[in-house]
C-alpha cells in the first residue's frame, strides 16, 4: 500500500524558476528511502510540501490517503500529527528539560499529563535516553541531542517520519547509530524518508534513493545492498 504519492508536483517561488518541477514518485507504507541531491536541489522544499509547511504550485500530493493539495487549513494540525520531523540542528528548547522538549507535541495535541508522561518515557526508551528526562539538552553531546530530536518526532507515533540532514553535524560512527534508530522505526511499520548529502552513508545502507537535480527527480533507484537483509548498520567490527 502507498503512504506517499507525488503526481506531477511543481513548486515555484515568486517569479523565479521552479524549485521543484514535475515530481512523480511513490513511497510504500513501511518503506525506508533516502532523498539526495546537491545543495539547492529542492530536498527541503519537497519535505516542506509533505509537512504542509508549503503548498505545491501544481500537481497532487497524497499522504496516508489524504490529498494535501485540497486539505483545508483547519485540517493541517491533524495531518501533522501523522508526520514526525527530525532536523539537522535539533531545534531543541535549551531552557527546558529533555522531558519538556519531547512532551511538547503532545501538549499541543491536548494529551493528558499522565498519557503524555507515558509516551515521553516510551519515546526516550526507544532512543536509549530513558532516565535522562530531568536533564537539560545543553548537557548532552551532539549525538544525544539528535536522539532527543528523534524522540520528539516519534512521541506521537507518526505513520511517516521525515528527516532533513539528521547526521550532518555528526561523525561517521554517530551517524550510523542514528541511522540504526531510523531503521528500528521502519521495522515496526513507519515510513521513513531521509534527506542527506552523505553519499557514503547511503551506499553503505543500501536502500532506495531518490535523486533530485535542479528541482527535477533525476532518478529513483535501489542501491545494491552491501549488508545482509538482517544486518544492522554498525554491526561490522572487523
Language model segments and positions:
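Catalytic Walker B motif of ABC-type/P-loop ATPase nucleotide-binding domains
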Residues: 161-164
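Conserved ABC ATPase signature
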Residues: 136-140, 144-146
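Short coil-to-helix segment of the ABC ATPase nucleotide-binding domain corresponding to the Q-loop/switch region
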Residues: 96-103
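Conserved ABC transporter NBD signature motif
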Residues: 59-67
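Helix-to-loop junction immediately C-terminal to a conserved catalytic motif
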Residues: 51
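A short, proline-enriched helix->beta-strand linker immediately N-terminal to the Walker B motif
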Residues: 155-159
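ABC ATPase NBD coupling module
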Residues: 14, 68-84, 187
